[in-house]
Amino acid sequence: MSSDFPHYNFRMPNIGFQNLPLNIYIVVFGTAIFVFILSLLFCCYLIRLRHQAHKEFYAYKQVILKEKVKELNLHELCAVCLEDFKPRDELGICPCKHAFHRKCLIKWLEVRKVCPLCNMPVLQLAQLHSKQDRGPPQGPLPGAENIV
């Protein structure tokens, strides 16, 4: 083969891994991105678990207001923030059937574990489960859609 092309030398130069800095950077950068994405997914999972545990911590129901319902003992405004209820508001309903904005009720229950209107205790789930094992489970509230 060298006789066909006498002026050309067809030897491949010896290139070691040390002479390819771009490959090293690609591997390191790719690994760093992979670890970053994994840690981001793990953080999102932990945040989701925290929100789920926070929802289940108190024994109130979460509903989305579709229309005015008399059975829920709804007043025209939230007793915590004093704003009117609007359609599609997320409501928290205490066992005593008093309704509040969900965020208002969460903030209230972090300070006091009672209904803002009637001071009836809003039990934590551990206490509620022991009582529900003896009685029949409650169905969804009329006129309201449960949030999943």
Swiss-Prot record:
CDD domains attached to this UniProt entry: RING-H2_RNF24
**Is the keyword Membrane in the record?**
yes
Q: How does it sit in the membrane?
A: Single-pass membrane protein
Keyword Metal-binding recorded: yes
Give any GO molecular function from the UniProt entry: zinc ion binding
Q: Which UniProt keywords apply?
A: Golgi apparatus, Membrane, Metal-binding, Transmembrane, Transmembrane helix, Zinc, Zinc-finger
Matching SUPFAM superfamilies: RING/U-box (SSF57850)
Q: What is its main location?
A: Golgi
Instruction: Identify the Gene3D superfamilies for this entry.
Output: Zinc/RING finger domain, C3HC4 (zinc finger) (3.30.40.10)
Domain of life the protein comes from: Eukaryota
Q: Where are the zinc fingers (RING-type)?
A: 78-119
Subcellular localization, as worded in the UniProt entry: Golgi apparatus membrane
Summarizing the function annotation, the protein's role is:
May play a role in TRPCs intracellular trafficking.
Write down what this protein is called.
RING finger protein 24
Q: Which organism is it from?
A: Homo sapiens (Human)
